[in-house]
């Protein structure tokens, strides 16, 4: 099984994803680590990625996931078509949607320095977000341990 922890930047994908992978004893994969240099440069310049930027990245992630038996992937996966591309050819993918309101996420982003995701891109991420229909939905205003415990319980069902 692959668990994809998804949501906008600042929702806690990496933090919760790493903790979940530790809890389950699964491999953790951060999608951000697999962006090509051109994507990183574009985001660092405050420009949102478009589909042409994303497809090769999503294809790379899909290839990595196909090699895994059990893994947690932290990935924005904002649109349904991106999620479809990620899951293509994989037997079981569970989506974990980290949901938080704009003000909460903005305050989190203001407190951190992401290597290439300026907080100015948050509005474009919320605008692009297509919440998944079938997902484990987690309210990220709860603490990390509570979020991880809730996700682990749902994945065990």
Task: Label the predicted regions.
Residues 13:
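Conserved lysine of the Walker
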Residues 18-60:
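Conserved substrate/cofactor phosphate-moiety recognition/catalytic segment
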